[in-house]
Amino acid sequence: MNDPIGDMLTRIRNSQMRGKSTVMTPASKLRAWVLDVLQSEGYIRGYESATDERGHPALEISLKYYEGEPVIRELKRVSKPGRRVYMGVNDIPSVRQGLGVSIVSTPKGVMSDANARAANVGGEVLCTVF
């Protein structure tokens, strides 16, 4: 797998289109940190460590719906393995005039765009969520 974060975002997007309540994805620290941001911003119910059918470590993500519709309307990968996107604190874009969230990997950890601005740090923009 060349893009683990992109794979996880695609699994979430596909599962929500099918109306699934949970989705499994292979475990990694970076994926867990991204899920922490999604949970703190209210886009997923939560996640927990699990094992897949072959015994490999995995993360089971509990998806969130509001009145039968997915809470996440748009989930886009920004920085990709073939084209990394780094931005300074003043260049981090607001998503949909502040209604959405950019997830940024900074030297101080993975955080939302608002937290990155508050901490005055830039970094790699992993994805945007609306």
Swiss-Prot record:
<comment type="subunit">
    <text>Part of the 30S ribosomal subunit. Contacts proteins S5 and S12.</text>
</comment>
<comment type="similarity">
    <text>Belongs to the universal ribosomal protein uS8 family.</text>
</comment>
<dbReference type="GO" id="GO:0019843">
    <property type="term" value="F:rRNA binding"/>
</dbReference>
<keyword id="KW-0689">Ribosomal protein</keyword>
<keyword id="KW-0699">rRNA-binding</keyword>
<keyword id="KW-0694">RNA-binding</keyword>
<dbReference type="GO" id="GO:1990904">
    <property type="term" value="C:ribonucleoprotein complex"/>
</dbReference>
<dbReference type="Pfam" id="PF00410">
    <property type="entry name" value="Ribosomal_S8"/>
</dbReference>
<comment type="function">
    <text>One of the primary rRNA binding proteins, it binds directly to 16S rRNA central domain where it helps coordinate assembly of the platform of the 30S subunit.</text>
</comment>
<dbReference type="GO" id="GO:0005840">
    <property type="term" value="C:ribosome"/>
</dbReference>
<dbReference type="GO" id="GO:0006412">
    <property type="term" value="P:translation"/>
</dbReference>
<protein>
    <recommendedName>
        <fullName>Small ribosomal subunit protein uS8</fullName>
    </recommendedName>
</protein>
<dbReference type="InterPro" id="IPR000630">
    <property type="entry name" value="Ribosomal_uS8"/>
</dbReference>
<dbReference type="GO" id="GO:0003735">
    <property type="term" value="F:structural constituent of ribosome"/>
</dbReference>
<keyword id="KW-0687">Ribonucleoprotein</keyword>
<dbReference type="InterPro" id="IPR047863">
    <property type="entry name" value="Ribosomal_uS8_CS"/>
</dbReference>
<dbReference type="InterPro" id="IPR035987">
    <property type="entry name" value="Ribosomal_uS8_sf"/>
</dbReference>
